[in-house]
């Protein structure tokens, strides 16, 4: 199937952008099968997610940014505190889009459009 030039945004663009606006960070590695599953959930909209590649290009080490963040498993998602909480929430493993919605307040609609709940 050849990739064509699509007009308009991908179905999950607004949701992915909302995750980034809310401060969600996704840490992964290019060689990680579960990261590939997570990426597939977003499709073309993955480019709008705040993704941090943790693997060195030779896949034998971890980049300093991920060492400093304490990342030990992939995929890992960090979410900033939502009042009254004061600490970052970290979840490890493939997350369903609905879970990401709950963690951020970004609404996942049937059309893929997202809005923020008050």
Task: Label each PLM-derived region with a short phrase.
Residues 4-50:
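Local sequence-structure signature of Cys/Sec-based thiol-disulfide redox active-site neighborhoods
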Residues 18, 28, 56-65:
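Structural microenvironment flanking redox-active thiols in thiol-disulfide oxidoreductases
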Residues 30-35, 55-59, 72-73, 83-85, ...:
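Solvent-exposed loop/turn segments at secondary-structure junctions
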Residues 38-41, 60, 72, 112:
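Secreted/processed peptides and extracellular or luminal domains of membrane proteins
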Residues 49-52, 77:
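Charged, surface-exposed interaction regions in soluble eukaryotic proteins
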Residues 63-80:
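Structural micro-motif
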